[in-house]
Amino acid sequence: MSNPESLKKQVEPPGYNELFMVEDVCNVDLEQGLDLCKPEKVNKQSQRSRQSRQSLFTNTIKPQKDKMNIKTNKIKEFLNDLFTEFSKFHNSYYPDGRISTRSNFRWPLLIIWSIIIVFAVDKKFEVQKFLSIWINENRFYSEIWVPIAIYVCLLVLMLLSLIFFAEFAVLALRVTGVIIAVLGMIIAVLGMIIAALGATITGLLYFGHWALYKLVILSLGFKIVTPGDVCVSNTLPTHNGETALHSETTVGSDIEQIELQNMPTPVKK
């Protein structure tokens, strides 16, 4: 059988028995039942508590930061891989102003493009015919091998030009694009300036006309007759030279009266 007092001591919290043996209850460590009146003990215990709190805080925060860093790194790696795979797929991006040449179809495409250009140039300028005539005059002509050699030489020259002058062509295209953009901006700015000048000149002319109308014509007392104020009426002269207004119904009778008045009177014998 176990001692009941020992069981009671194990069940009770630490420092329970020592709590009543200390005079100042406010300066007692309730966890360990120690007197806290000495400043050394207080400082040591406060430092321990701070260290424990800091360690707890760091242990709870650091894993979250590490998880965030891992997630962001994974996202960056995924985006980089996606970009590289996409660039390999379509192979049309320009890193640092240079054309990517990793495509397996580069040389076949260059050869086909060169053949098309050679035949187009030969059809337009008849290079093969001209060179054949020149070779025939110098007695080095063959109906089969000379045209083949001419086309092969032209093809090689075209390939070399496409390979070595591609960088200059891209640079020229970039420069022309920049020049066109700058010219477009200049033309747009000039158009805006011309439109602003036109609006300003129109406003000045309108203001000048309004000032002339208000200050000169009205101040001198002139009366402006508008087209609506003019009414057209049928007027006929009378026998004594006066004018009078007549309606359309009395025009015929007035003419008859005028004719009767102008007729000579018969002379009585």
UniProtKB/Swiss-Prot annotation:
InterPro entries: DUF999. This is UPF0494 membrane protein C1348.01. The chain crosses the membrane at residues 107-127, 144-164, 177-197, 201-221. Belongs to the UPF0494 family. It holds the Pfam family DUF999. It is found in: Vacuole membrane. It is a multi-pass membrane protein. It comes from the Eukaryota. Keywords: Membrane, Transmembrane, Transmembrane helix, Vacuole. GO terms for cellular component: fungal-type vacuole; vacuolar membrane.
